[in-house]
Amino acid sequence: MPGPLFLEGNAVTLRPIEREDLEFLHRVMNDPAVWRPALDIDPMNYEQGEEFFETVLSSSDGVHCLACTDEEPLGVLSLTGSQYGPDETSRSRAAEIAYWFAPEHHGQGYGSDATARLIQYAFEDRNLRRLEARVGSFNDASIGLLESLGFEHEGTLREAAWYRGEYHDMCWYGLLRDEWQSGQE
């Protein structure tokens, strides 16, 4: 059963990740359709899942949410490396946004809805100035999602990602708060 409501999108809700969600995380994070394109997810056993929950998901370094419809978990979204607050001179006020969804929920608009809501939270509630995202050049779905939400391709790290037996470029995307706000009008 997902935790209490944190944010609400059009079709999904975002909730804190709870210990009860570890079964879902374990199943999906071990699915090659998720960990291969994500590039930084390692397959894990239950003990490693517990450790991941304790050291990453339960830490105060970042925001980690479970995207759900009703009571069904769909995927995970995160804001990490965030430096936020009202003091514009001493903080960069930037964060990296990341997401992954269970394969059975791909292509249904849940990722776009959930990511848009987390972006809104980052800019309006956390006063961030910019968001960044990394994606392998082979991941057309994720690139399409980012671009549909206004992210701009800012650079490429050539042959920085190993995927399915080949090196691929790693693309860096960025979105500024002003760009997001003008796209919402």
Language-model segments: which ranges?
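Acyl-donor (CoA/ACP) binding surface of acyl/acetyltransferases
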Residues: 1-23, 29-31, 68-185
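Proline-rich low-complexity regions
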Residues: 2-6, 43, 61
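Generic alpha-helical structural context detector
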Residues: 26-27, 54
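Polar helix-capping/helix-linker motif
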Residues: 31-32, 59
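Conserved GNAT-fold acetyl-CoA-binding loop/helix
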Residues: 33-55
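Short secondary-structure junction motifs
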Residues: 36, 60-62, 128-130
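A short, aromatic/hydrophobic, helix- or strand-capping loop or linear motif
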Residues: 37-42, 63-69
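A short helix-loop-beta-strand connector motif used in the catalytic cores of GNAT acetyltransferases and
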Residues: 53-66, 73-75
